[in-house]
């Protein structure tokens, strides 16, 4: 059993190094719907990958990056609010993905693996690819950390300091899109956003500084992954949703902590 769980455990711990800090920005900037839009659009990536006979997860990465770029452009060049655009894109892509899968008559598609993840099927090859992606995202995040933080805390002050706010928003969206694509096999399209927001929301109850919030979020994420895999192993439950349940449980426990005066 340990041999089966170990690659999944290692992958989850590696992913938490980027889902936690990016989740902090998602919570601060109230971007949860952006994450949902990209994750729900992943089904279209699966359908296109199968149709074009390429690895569906590669198709998901490419599609989420294209959608992130498109959303940045649409937000700046149309009169619609970002929530309206996200709603249109999310439901259009999800519906188009379902219809496209339905048209693939000669191909059997196990949607459950893509919707809720296939965590226990992760192997060391997957871990290598995910690890490379994590290094890229984490390195970029560390390099732009101060600028991203400044534009999040006080956009006006950041602009005075000469920071390009649109560029930072674009970078954050691209990093979030790549993180969601990398995490898709871990927990699936429908619940991937929970890996971003729940540990970050829990960490907010304990942190005093942005950096400490990231640290707490990483700890909460790792605890959720370990607890979820143990729950899955003992009770034969779906691994991805089990991780989310543990994460939600930690959040509920954090609500009993008294607020600082």
Curated annotation (Swiss-Prot):
GO process annotations (BP): response to zinc ion; transmembrane transport; zinc ion transport
Major site of localization recorded for this protein: membrane
Membrane topology designation: Multi-pass membrane protein
Transmembrane segments: 8-28, 54-74, 84-104, 125-145, 171-191, 214-234, 236-256
Pfam families membership: ABC-3
SUPFAM superfamilies membership: ABC transporter involved in vitamin B12 uptake, BtuC
PANTHER family given in the database record: ABC-TRANSPORTER METAL-BINDING PROTEIN, HIGH-AFFINITY ZINC UPTAKE SYSTEM MEMBRANE PROTEIN ZNUB
Protein's name in the database: High-affinity zinc uptake system membrane protein ZnuB
Taxonomic path: Bacteria, Pseudomonadati, Pseudomonadota, Gammaproteobacteria, Pasteurellales
Gene: znuB
């Amino acid at each position: 059993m340990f041999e089966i769980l170990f690659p999944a455990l290692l992958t989850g711990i590696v992913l938490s190094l980027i889902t936690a800090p990016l989740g902090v920005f998602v919570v601060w900037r109230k971007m949860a719907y952006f994450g949902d839009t990209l994750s729900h659009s992943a089904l279209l990536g699966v359908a296109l990958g199968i149709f074009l006979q390429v690895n569906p997860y590669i198709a998901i990465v490419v599609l989420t990056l294209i959608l992130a770029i498109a959303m940045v452009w649409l937000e700046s060049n149309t009169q619609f609010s970002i929530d309206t655009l996200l709603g249109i894109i999310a439901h259009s892509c999800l519906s188009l993905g379902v219809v496209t899968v339905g048209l693939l008559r000669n191909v059997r598609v196990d949607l459950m693996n893509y919707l809720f993840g296939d965590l226990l099927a992760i192997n060391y090859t997957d871990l290598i690819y995910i690890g490379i992606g994590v290094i890229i995202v984490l390195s970029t995040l560390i390099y732009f950390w101060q600028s991203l933080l400044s534009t999040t805390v006080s956009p006006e002050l950041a602009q005075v300091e000469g920071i390009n706010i649109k560029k930072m928003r674009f970078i954050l969206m691209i990093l979030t899109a790549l993180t969601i694509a990398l995490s898709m096999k871990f927990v699936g399209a429908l619940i991937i956003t929970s890996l971003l927001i729940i540990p970050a929301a829990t960490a907010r109850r304990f942190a005093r500084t942005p950096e400490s919030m990231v640290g707490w979020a990483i700890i909460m994420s790792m605890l959720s992954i370990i607890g979820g895999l143990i729950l899955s192993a003992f009770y034969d439950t779906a691994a991805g949703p089990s991780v989310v349940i543990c994460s939600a449980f930690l959040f509920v426990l954090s609500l009993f902590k008294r607020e600082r005066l």
